[in-house]
């Protein structure tokens, strides 16, 4: 039996005041306090020069297969302002998940806080 794709339209949002407080805490300290249970792989690193030092927001997560960005296209319409789009594609680095048009749409139209690929 195939599981198929699942898209959840509702999610519980964190308190905005708590999210704002995370802008003052280094990510490494947060990971240490949480027993590193929510830490990302160290191969994930900054590849741009953001105007702000901290990228903080509720995560909008997307899991897809290598070479398949259908769930990512759905996320383009579902994520909102201030969200951090977190995309997993089974660690495939042979194909691009998104290009300049999608990035510009997320940044300027959707006004998300950032993207983690």
Residue ranges and their predicted role:
Residues 1-63, 70, 77:
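Intrinsically disordered, low-complexity regions enriched in acidic/Ser/Thr/Pro/Gln residues
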């Amino acid at each position: 039996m195939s599981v198929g794709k699942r898209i959840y339209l509702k999610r519980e949002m964190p308190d905005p005041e708590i999210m704002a407080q995370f802008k003052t805490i280094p990510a490494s300290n947060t990971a240490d306090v949480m027993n590193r249970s929510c830490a990302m792989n160290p191969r994930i690193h900054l590849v741009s020069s953001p105007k702000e030092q901290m990228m903080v927001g509720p995560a909008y997560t997307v899991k897809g297969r290598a070479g398949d960005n259908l769930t990512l296209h759905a996320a383009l319409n579902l994520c909102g302002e201030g969200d951090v789009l977190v995309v997993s594609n089974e660690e495939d680095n042979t194909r691009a998940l998104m290009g300049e048009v999608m990035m510009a749409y997320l940044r300027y139209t959707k006004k998300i806080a950032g993207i983690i690929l």
